[in-house]
Design a protein with these regions (language model features):
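C-terminal, well-structured catalytic/ligand-binding subdomain of enzymes
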Residues: 1-81, 114-349
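Gly/Pro-rich turn-and-neighbor structural signature
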Residues: 89-120
Length: 349
C-alpha cells in the first residue's frame, strides 16, 4: 500500500501552504516533472506550462477576488515546493485544464444518509494513476478545523469539519467551463467556513465556480446534493441520497454533455447503490463491501487515461472522522483519521 502522509496545516494562509509544500516537495516536483503533472499522458494535444499561463492567471484572478486566503495558500504551496507559482496553481486546476475530456468508466460514486446516524461515503475514480499522490490534510482553518483528502497538492478534495459537515463530490459535464473557482477549492472553503448544511449550500450557490460538479453535503440531520451547471444550481434533499456522473435535475439533464458510454456506467453505479441500500453508519463492513465491488468499484485496466478507483472513504460528520482506503479499496488496508484524535494528541493513527 502506498504511504499516505498526514499533514497538519495551521497558521496564516501562506504558512499553511508552505508547510504543505515542504512536506511533499520531492513528490510534487516529481509529479510536475512527469509530463507536466501527467497531463501530457491524458490530454489529446501536447501541453506545456507556458501555453497554460494565460488560463491559469484568469482562474487565479477570480480565486484571489473570491477566496483571497486560499489564493495566498496556493502561493505558499509554490514557495514550499520550490516551484513556479503557476505550477502550484496548475495543481489546483488540472481538471479544468483537461476540460471535457473523455469520461468512460467512472468518476466517483457518492451517497449519504441521515436515516440513522449520518454518513457520507464515496469512491474516488480518477485517471492519471493518482493513488501515489494521496495525502490527508489536518487543517486549522480561519473558522473550523477539518480533515481533508487531497491528491497531488490539491488544497481540497473532500472531507469533514468540526461543525459536523461532511462534503463529497462527483464530476458532471455541462455548461461553459470558464475562469472561476475550481470546485476542489470551493470544497475546502466550505470545510473552513460552514457552520451548517444551509451555510454550505449558500457558499456553493454564491461562488463563481469554474466547472460543473455535483456536491454531496451531509450534516448530522440533513443530506443535500447541490448540482452546479454554469451559474445555476439545483438542490436535492432526502434522508438517503446517491449521485454518480449524470445530472439528476430534469432541467439540467437536458443539457448533460456526458457521452453515452459514460452515462451507461453512471446509471449502473447509481442503480447499484439504490438496489443495495445505504448501510447503517456504523456498519463499516457493508459500506466497504459496497464501495469495493463492481460496478461501483472501477478496476484498473492499465490505461492511465481511463478513470479507475484510486481511493474510497466513509465520512462521519457526527464523529469528525474519515475512514480511508487508499488505492483499490478491495485490496487496500483501511485507516482512520479523526478530529478528536487530532485535538487530543495532535496526531492521527
Amino acid at each position: 500500500m502506498n504511504s499516505v502522509p498526514l499533514l497538519e496545516l495551521s497558521g496564516p494562509p501562506r504558512a499553511r501552504g508552505i508547510t504543505h509544500g515542504r512536506a511533499l516537495a520531492g513528490r510534487l516536483r516529481g509529479f510536475l516533472d512527469d509530463s507536466l503533472a501527467r497531463l501530457g499522458h491524458l490530454a489529446d494535444r501536447p501541453v506545456d506550462l507556458d501555453s497554460l499561463r494565460p488560463s491559469i492567471a484568469a482562474h487565479r484572478d477570480v480565486v484571489a477576488a473570491a477566496l483571497p486566503d486560499l489564493a495566498e495558500e496556493v502561493d505558499g504551496l509554490a514557495a514550499g515546493v520550490g516551484v513556479d507559482r503557476d505550477a502550484a496553481w496548475l495543481l489546483q486546476l488540472r481538471r479544468e485544464v483537461l476540460g471535457y475530456s473523455r469520461v468512460t468508466a467512472g468518476d466517483c460514486t457518492t451517497y449519504a444518509s441521515v436515516r440513522g446516524r449520518p454518513v457520507l461515503a464515496q469512491t474516488v475514480d480518477l485517471n492519471g494513476n493518482l493513488d501515489d499522490q494521496i495525502a490527508v490534510l489536518a487543517v486549522s482553518g480561519p473558522r473550523h478545523r477539518s480533515l481533508v483528502l487531497s491528491f497531488a497538492g490539491l488544497l481540497g478534495y473532500l472531507g469533514v469539519n468540526d461543525a459536523g459537515i461532511a462534503i463529497g463530490l462527483n464530476l458532471v459535464l455541462g455548461g461553459e467551463w470558464e475562469p472561476g473557482v475550481p470546485p476542489y477549492l470551493a470544497i475546502r472553503h466550505v470545510l473552513d467556513s460552514a457552520d451548517s448544511v444551509d451555510q454550505a449550500v449558500e457558499i456553493l450557490c454564491e461562488l463563481p465556480l469554474a466547472s460543473s460538479r455535483s456536491f454531496m453535503i451531509c450534516g448530522e440531520e440533513r443530506a443535500v446534493c447541490v448540482e452546479s451547471l454554469g451559474s445555476q444550481r439545483s438542490i436535492l434533499e432526502d434522508a438517503d441520497l446517491a449521485h454518480t456522473n449524470h445530472f439528476l435535475d430534469p432541467d439540467f439533464a437536458e443539457r448533460d454533455e456526458i457521452n453515452v458510454f459514460a452515462k451507461n456506467s453512471s446509471r449502473r453505479r447509481l442503480e447499484a447503490v439504490r438496489e443495495a441500500g445505504i448501510p447503517d453508519a456504523s456498519d463499516t463492513a457493508s459500506h466497504h463491501r459496497l464501495l469495493s465491488t463492481p460496478p461501483i468499484l472501477v478496476p484498473d485496466n492499465g490505461d492511465i487515461r481511463r478513470e479507475r478507483t484510486v481511493a474510497a472513504v466513509i465520512l462521519r460528520p457526527d464523529l469528525g472522522e474519515i475512514r480511508l482506503w487508499p488505492g483499490d479499496p478491495s485490496t487496500a488496508e483501511g485507516q482512520v483519521h479523526s478530529l478528536q484524535q487530532w485535538s487530543a494528541s495532535g496526531s492521527h493513527r
